[in-house]
A protein has these predicted regions:
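Short acidic, glycine/serine/threonine-rich loops at helix termini
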Residues: 39-41, 122-127
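Short glycine-aspartate micro-motif
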Residues: 26, 107-112, 136
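Acyl-CoA/ACP chain-elongation machinery
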Residues: 76, 117-122
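Conserved beta-ketoacyl condensing-enzyme motif
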Residues: 1-70, 74
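Short beta-strand segments
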Residues: 28-31, 85, 112-116
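Active-site-proximal alpha-helical scaffold in enzymes
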Residues: 8-13, 85-108
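Condensing-enzyme catalytic core mediating Claisen C-C bond formation in acyl metabolism
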Residues: 73, 79-82, 125-148
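Flexible, glycine/proline-enriched loop segments at strand-loop-helix junctions
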Residues: 54-59, 81-89
Length: 148
């Protein structure tokens, strides 16, 4: 598993520890560098004609949404999942997208978050939201929590 997938997987584990397997939980993640950390490693493996060794184990992680697949497999999720690329955490988008999924019945719960990983520098900010939440789910709350 690549660094981005490990980061997302471990952060999601904390949120899903009390959730039943196969729950109707959607995943909406974003970051800035996509899968660039793994892309660079893969490019190095194919750049040298004398030492050409493309690794299928590395190649599979050259898409950022693979981390969502790892989480889905672990928790038997068969729900909506999307991975977006933004210059910075976008609380307006996250709140709107998650609320849309909840209000249209596409999911009972949504794990949203920012999982950035590049050159051993990382940040994970994930949260679980449902219609029965105790904290208002809006961009103001998200912005405040993200910047803590």
């Amino acid at each position: 598993m690549d660094g981005l997938s490990k980061l997302a997987f471990l952060a999601a584990e904390l949120l899903m520890k009390n959730e039943p397997e196969g729950s109707d939980t959607a995943l909406v993640f974003a970051n800035k560098s996509s899968s660039l950390d793994t892309d660079v490693k893969y490019q190095k493996s194919i750049s040298d004609a004398e030492n050409y060794f493309p690794s299928p184990a590395v190649f599979v992680y050259t898409l950022p949404n693979i981390c969502l697949g790892e989480i889905s497999i672990r928790h038997q999720l068969k729900s909506e999942n999307s991975f977006f690329i933004f210059d910075a955490f976008n609380p307006v988008f996250m709140a709107n997208y998650a609320n849309l999924l909840l209000n249209t019945g596409k999911a009972e719960k949504v794990i949203c978050g920012w999982t950035e990983y590049f050159n051993e520098d990382y940040k994970a900010f994930l949260y679980l939201v449902s219609k029965e939440g105790k904290i208002p789910h809006n961009y103001q709350t998200l912005e405040a929590e993200y910047t803590k």
